[in-house]
């Protein structure tokens, strides 16, 4: 009985606090930007910049918090006004400090459309940028991922799709995680010329399994 009374009191206090805080917030916040949807953020400690992926528009926003300024980096064939075939998902840096490269993963815009319109074979891609970035920056190299998806399907009978994130090892190889179809990771060489169906696991029945992220432990 004492426990029940204590929990009820805590819930009541939390409810009162919640109401008090929310009373000062506006009921509606209007953001007049078409399809603005942040997906991933990474911080460049050396340059003190944030890199933000814009999901729907397929762009990378570079934000300088000190100067309160920003610019967008566009990728040909990926960036759009919000209705393109690809969407920007994960970002990663080659190294924790003094990174010379930024990597960007772009998934097909119909990958996570859980309806009859969902696609597992639409265009998706992976891009390597030299740092520092400018508004005119273009990828040093780009890889389209249909080929490695085909290879996974040939090996396993299942097709991974919905690329979401990448990580880089000490040698500069990239590892790209697929979130849907099957749990799978593709490996890409530092120059982008070799793409390998590197690792996979069996799917979990009729569910849509996969990896939602990946990171590299240097230790």
What are these regions (language model features)?
Residues 64-68, 130-135, 188-193:
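Short loop/turn segments that connect beta-strands within beta-propeller blades
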Residues 21-36:
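A short helix->beta-strand "capping" segment at the edge of beta-propeller domains
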Residues 27-30, 69-79, 137-148, 195-202:
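Beta-propeller fold detector
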Residues 33-47, 78-108, 143-174, 202-219:
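Beta-rich, blade/repeat-based domains predominating
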Residues 1-23:
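Fungal secretory targeting signals
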Residues 118-133:
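Beta-propeller blade signature
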Residues 55, 106-109, 179-181, 219:
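Short loop/turn segments immediately following the C-termini of beta-strands
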Residues 50-76:
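Beta-propeller domains
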């Amino acid at each position: 009985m004492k426990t029940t009374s204590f929990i009820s009191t805590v819930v009541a206090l939390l409810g009162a606090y919640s109401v008090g805080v929310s009373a000062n917030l506006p009921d509606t916040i209007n953001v007049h930007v078409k399809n603005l949807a942040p997906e991933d953020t990474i911080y460049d400690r050396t340059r003190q910049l944030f890199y933000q992926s814009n999901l729907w528009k397929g762009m990378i926003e570079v934000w300088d918090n000190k100067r309160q300024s920003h610019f967008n980096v566009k990728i040909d064939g990926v960036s759009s006004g919000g209705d393109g075939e690809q969407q920007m998902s994960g970002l990663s840096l080659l190294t924790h400090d003094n990174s010379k490269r930024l990597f960007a993963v772009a998934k097909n815009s119909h990958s996570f459309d859980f309806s009859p319109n969902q696609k597992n074979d639409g265009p998706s891609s992976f891009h390597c940028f030299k740092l520092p970035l400018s508004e005119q920056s273009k990828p040093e190299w780009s890889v389209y991922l249909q080929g490695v998806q085909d290879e996974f399907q040939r090996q396993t009978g299942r097709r991974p799709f919905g690329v979401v994130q990448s990580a880089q090892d000490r040698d500069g190889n990239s590892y790209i995680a697929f979130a849907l179809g099957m749990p799978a990771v593709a490996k890409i060489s530092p120059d982008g010329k070799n793409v390998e169906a590197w690792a996979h696991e069996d799917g979990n029945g009729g569910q849509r399994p996969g990896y939602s992220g990946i990171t590299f432990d240097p230790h």
